[in-house]
């Protein structure tokens, strides 16, 4: 039986989703808090996501430069298995997300102040 998320990990997922992050991406990011490398099936088992959801999340993480991929060929037949590995430490990923959210908040405050000034 695959290990599921702890209550702490589920809270992390909830907080990421509160920041308007898609569920699949939030669950995949939290998965990497305890796993530095894996294959898609392992992510699916632990996060309770389907393969297309995992693939979409992994594409985002790869575009950000947060993971590396490696194709593992199993013999001569069949599709290769993709192995994923963190390219940056998990805490760096989270700190980047926090900085981005702080920047959004700062930008929103400026816009709200501008709106307030225009209405006075």
Where are these regions (language model features)?
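Short alpha-helical segments that sit at the start of domains
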Residues: 2-26
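Short, cationic-aromatic polyanion-contact patches
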Residues: 15-24, 39, 72-94
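Key DNA-contact positions within bacterial/archaeal DNA-binding proteins
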Residues: 26, 52-53
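Short amphipathic alpha-helical elements of helix-turn-helix/winged-helix folds
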Residues: 30-35
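A short acidic, leucine-rich amphipathic alpha-helix
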Residues: 42-46, 61
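Glycine-centered, phosphate/nucleic-acid-interacting loop/turn motifs that mediate DNA/RNA or nucleotide
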Residues: 65-66
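Amphipathic alpha-helical dimerization/coiled-coil segments
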Residues: 88-120
């Amino acid at each position: 039986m695959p290990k599921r998320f702890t209550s702490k990990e589920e809270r992390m997922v909830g907080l990421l989703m509160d920041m308007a992050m898609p569920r699949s991406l939030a669950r995949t990011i939290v998965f990497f808090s305890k796993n530095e490398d894996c294959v898609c099936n392992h992510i699916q088992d632990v996060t309770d996501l389907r393969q297309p959801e995992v693939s979409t999340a992994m594409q985002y993480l790869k575009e950000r430069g947060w993971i590396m991929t490696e194709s593992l060929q199993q013999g001569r037949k069949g599709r290769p298995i993709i192995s994923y590995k963190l390219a940056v430490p998990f805490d760096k990923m989270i700190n980047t997300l926090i900085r981005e959210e702080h920047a959004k908040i700062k930008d929103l405050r400026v816009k709200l102040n501008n709106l307030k000034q225009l209405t006075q």
